[in-house]
């Protein structure tokens, strides 16, 4: 006869195995949808929206990649600022080369970005599961996967989904080691940060999550947590590698201030930023809302094919109520916010769950503030890396409300389904 404690352990083990299987299936489904979506976007000529450099990253599928990285070329530029994406693509194309008998190199490259996006979905599921019951984590993971920024950039060739996925992996890793710190966990977290900073140096803002979390939980005792300071050194190390080694390679040295180095790039873009009400409004609507849900079925406004620009959404939130589908989505989102405000109660799902909201908010705010100063016009490119933080800031208080469990699950399921359909219409055009 199995003892009660042994039976409980067996049940717990079965639960964890089932969770791993479910999360893997969701990630696999995301990969399939993203890869199929990439073909739909090509068919409707929709791969160059939101200032994406798809036309440039598509060259990563062609042979002799590093031989084509010549001085003052666009390939040299993306290698200088996003070397992880370039090296990842080069390695991937070598690995899948035997599959060119059935797929074109372009299709195989699209599969890479779809797989990277799916890995981010898998990471998001574990991030939600670290703070919420599995039924909520699963639904919020589907919402993350269906969000427009994640879906779109997983379906085209762009470095931004690599950064978003590394951000999700970082968040999931930290949330899971938060209550059980280990040296190996800290090393893994630092490795993710280093790779993320190599792909986009602004990923350094991820350090705000453990740093602010330590301050919130331990206040001045946090200064004794030496590992966070050592962990943060991954960012300047990555910058030194980018500026001192990669930029020092003659083939990638640039001269224009827009791309000569990271500092001149920041100053060049920031000097062109206009701080007006319209710019703030457009930035916030895109960063917070368009990144999650498409406000209209097409994004052809201000399109200019001569410069590989497929257009953006018309600035403004009123387009959400122009169709019954998006209007219903808005109504569900409003209901979710109303539940959070009206039925809120003390967050006690897991110990210290409420405390993580401040670090997540700190990361989301610093990333948004930087890109508002740096490049507000192209903010749709950079918002997917904040998607998980934004959704966690909604998921945690919503799970803690006094709304009945069945009603919570129903509302989230409807929201996930409508978001998938709404953004799916945009993908297929």
Where are these regions (language model features)?
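Short acidic/glycine- and proline-prone juxtamembrane loop motifs at membrane-interface regions
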Residues: 155-160
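Membrane-interface alpha helices of multi-pass inner-membrane proteins
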Residues: 184-201, 206-211, 233-234, 415
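Transmembrane-helix signature of polytopic, membrane-embedded enzymes
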Residues: 124-146, 164
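Specific aromatic-rich, kink-prone transmembrane helix
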Residues: 123, 150, 162-180, 185-193, ...
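Short hydrophobic/aromatic helix or loop-helix immediately within or flanking a transmembrane segment
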Residues: 71-102
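Transmembrane-helix motifs of polytopic, lipid-linked glycan transferases
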Residues: 111-131, 169
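Membrane-lumen/periplasm interface segments of specific transmembrane helices
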Residues: 33, 37, 226-327
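Perimembrane helix-loop-helix junctions
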Residues: 2-5, 11, 176, 205-237
